[in-house]
Amino acid sequence: MAAATLGQVWARKLLPVPWLLCGSKRCVSSIFKAADLQIQMTKEPQKKPAPSQALLFGKTFTDHMLMVEWNNKAGWGPPRIQPFQNLTLHPACSGLHYSLQLFEGLKAYKGGDQQVRLFRPWLNMDRMLRSARRLCLPDFDKQELLECIRQLIEVDKDWVPDGNGTSLYVRPVLIGNEPSLGVGMVTQALLYVILCPVGSYFPGDSMTPVSLLADPSFVRAWIGGVGDCKLGGNYGPTVAVQREAQKRGCEQVLWLYGPDHQLTEVGTMNIFVYWTHEDGVLELVTPPLNGVILPGVVRQSLLDLARTWGEFRVAERKVTMKELKRALEEGRVREVFGSGTACQVCPVHQILYEGKQLHIPTMENGPELILRFQKELKAIQYGASAHDWMFRV
């Protein structure tokens, strides 16, 4: 895509990102540019998965990766696409010791026209920069990074799977690479991007609902914390709770917050409730962006689609377990589901809360809304329905 065209598109999509007090303003004048991108092609290309081969999430990687290094004296070095390889890190690397690291996750889809498109990557770039500033990691130009990612996908375009529900998962990462045991702002950092061909979250056209453990003794995030940033430190501590959920016969965790047991997230997904509110109005509601939950790209997309339809009320506000239990008792709940890049939309059919199993009638109701969201998203992502959410590679 020509630079001028990319700039026009970006101008329509760009969201403001406020400075934090610790934001590394010293880095603003130092940006890497896609025009300086260096490309080194692999001499040992891997065998690509067969079309019939099952693609497990995050297990298969493409031939190349994007790498950009930064230090506080020279700023950003030139970006380079190079053969996929292991990293060499100092044993005292601050990204390993103090979780000074963040990541993103987005997908590229191959349409029936064989055109590859990224789904709303501008939102991922915005979120990535917000996360970087929260950790005092160096700033970068979102437009330039997106163009570098586009060129990386173009180099490995033959890895983009062509099949129903398949995609190329894109994982940008930014880590502090300080070779010191001191805790503070880094003087070295590393940004890299790797690619994974992935299959459908739900095999075929099936849609398997999940059961949730809702235990208020476990907390994922809190007001004033970093729950709204995509940091590695938000994910590692959830593994033990996920294991506890499995011990209790549940697939995922419903994260609660506060003394009133507010619904926040499902596993690593945002959560939605489709119900008739106590005021008698049909409504789709999801928790607000108050700093506790991650501002998901699919979350925003579902809200945008629902508001475009104009068929029911769409709300972003606090929802408590007390409200959900009452609505279930009164038969007002239609569907409960999670949303995220991996699954798009995932139905919920059961919640274990305070020692009792709460049945959610999601599947008995179609799930009508979930299937509609899935259909609309798929049409947009695979190019059957033209939409300015998609960024052509």
Swiss-Prot record:
GO terms for biological process: amino acid biosynthetic process; branched-chain amino acid biosynthetic process; branched-chain amino acid catabolic process; branched-chain amino acid metabolic process; cellular response to leukemia inhibitory factor; isoleucine catabolic process; isoleucine metabolic process; L-leucine metabolic process. Its EC number is 2.6.1.42. Substrate binds at residue 169. The keyword Transferase applies. The modification N6-(pyridoxal phosphate)lysine is found at residue 230. It comes from the Eukaryota. CDD domains: BCAT_beta_family. It is found in: Mitochondrion. Keywords: Acetylation, Amino-acid biosynthesis, Aminotransferase, Branched-chain amino acid biosynthesis, Lipid metabolism, Mitochondrion, Pyridoxal phosphate, Transferase, Transit peptide. It catalyses: L-leucine + 2-oxoglutarate = 4-methyl-2-oxopentanoate + L-glutamate; L-isoleucine + 2-oxoglutarate = (S)-3-methyl-2-oxopentanoate + L-glutamate; L-valine + 2-oxoglutarate = 3-methyl-2-oxobutanoate + L-glutamate. It is an enzyme of class 2 (transferase). One of its GO terms (cellular component) is mitochondrion. Its cofactor is pyridoxal 5'-phosphate. Residues 1-27 form a transit peptide. The keyword Acetylation applies. Homodimer. Catalyzes the first reaction in the catabolism of the essential branched chain amino acids leucine, isoleucine, and valine. May also function as a transporter of branched chain alpha-keto acids. NCBIfam families: ilvE_II (TIGR01123), PRK13357.1 (NF009897). Belongs to the class-IV pyridoxal-phosphate-dependent aminotransferase family. This is Branched-chain-amino-acid aminotransferase, mitochondrial. It comes from Mus musculus (Mouse). The lineage of its organism: Eukaryota, Metazoa, Chordata, Craniata, Vertebrata. The gene is Bcat2.
